[in-house]
């Protein structure tokens, strides 16, 4: 049973519209859809809230550490609420998926994503769900850092917004219908 949804990103106005904050975007939209106002929770180093989907209480977490230190925030929440890795969904940007694509995955490595790398180290486990929001790759592989820390163009943002819409539905399906049905639905789009 899912208990915690975590959106990954970097805090601060200068990062708000960057591709690397795709996890924040989807978490914010989910909170808004459920009339949840995220509040600063210093003991979790995060913005934090609670929603109910299908009468099931779900915590929302938006770490306010930088992306590469997200594990600190996640570990604090998991200790406090006794949440196991299998009860967590991490929403993050994914270079290896084109814009407009979104995939749900259970378990696995970090795939070079430093936020996931830190979370895996902090939890001592890879056994959590990931909702991977495709942001595509830059043409020049040496420009990855600049690419993820820039805002997408309006055309690119349209594709990303479509995938965020699918992501919201996938979260609901994961909670109400289970991981297999959610994955099948999402991956058939």
From Swiss-Prot:
Site residues, Discriminates between blocked and unblocked aminoacyl-tRNA: 10
Subunit structure: Monomer.
Family designation: Belongs to the PTH family.
GO biological process terms on file: protein quality control for misfolded or incompletely synthesized proteins; rescue of stalled ribosome
Keyword set includes Nuclease: no
Annotated positions binding tRNA: 15, 66, 68, 114
Superkingdom assignment: Bacteria
Active site: residue positions: 20
NCBIfam families, sorted: pth
GO cellular component, one term: cytoplasm
UniProt cross-references to HAMAP family, sorted A to Z: Pept_tRNA_hydro_bact (MF_00083)
Keyword terms, alphabetized: Cytoplasm, Hydrolase, RNA-binding, tRNA-binding
UniProt organism field: Dichelobacter nodosus (strain VCS1703A)
Record-linked SUPFAM superfamilies: Peptidyl-tRNA hydrolase-like
Database matches in PANTHER family: PEPTIDYL-TRNA HYDROLASE
Subcellular location: Cytoplasm
Matches recorded under Gene3D superfamilies: Peptidyl-tRNA hydrolase
Site entry (Stabilizes the basic form of H active site to accept a proton), positions: 93
Enzyme Commission number(s) of this protein: 3.1.1.29
Reactions performed catalytically: an N-acyl-L-alpha-aminoacyl-tRNA + H2O = an N-acyl-L-amino acid + a tRNA + H(+)
UniProt GO MF annotations: peptidyl-tRNA hydrolase activity; tRNA binding
Protein name stated in the entry: Peptidyl-tRNA hydrolase
Known function: Hydrolyzes ribosome-free peptidyl-tRNAs (with 1 or more amino acids incorporated), which drop off the ribosome during protein synthesis, or as a result of ribosome stalling.
UniProt cross-references to InterPro entries, sorted A to Z: Pept_tRNA_hydro (IPR001328), Pept_tRNA_hydro_CS (IPR018171), Pept_tRNA_hydro_sf (IPR036416)
Statement: the UniProt record of this protein carries the keyword Glycoprotein: no
């Amino acid at each position: 049973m899912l208990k915690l949804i975590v959106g990954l990103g970097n805090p601060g106005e200068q990062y708000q519209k960057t591709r690397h904050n795709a996890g924040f975007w989807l978490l914010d939209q989910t909170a808004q859809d459920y009339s949840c106002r995220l509040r600063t929770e210093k003991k979790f180093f995060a913005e934090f809230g609670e929603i109910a989907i299908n009468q099931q209480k779900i915590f929302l977490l938006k770490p306010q550490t930088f992306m590469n230190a997200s594990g600190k925030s996640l570990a604090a929440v998991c200790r406090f609420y006794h949440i196991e890795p299998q009860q967590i969904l991490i929403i993050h940007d994914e270079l290896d998926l084109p814009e407009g694509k979104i995939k749900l995955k259970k378990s696995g490595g970090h795939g070079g994503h430093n936020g996931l790398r830190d979370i895996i180290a902090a939890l001592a486990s890879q056994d959590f769900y990931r909702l991977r929001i495709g942001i595509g790759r830059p043409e020049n592989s040496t420009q990855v850092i600049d690419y993820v820390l820039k805002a997408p163009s309006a055309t690119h943002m349209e594709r990303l917004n479509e995938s965020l819409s699918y992501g919201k539905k996938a979260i609901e399906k994961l909670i109400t219908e289970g991981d297999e049905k959610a994955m099948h639905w999402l991956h058939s789009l």
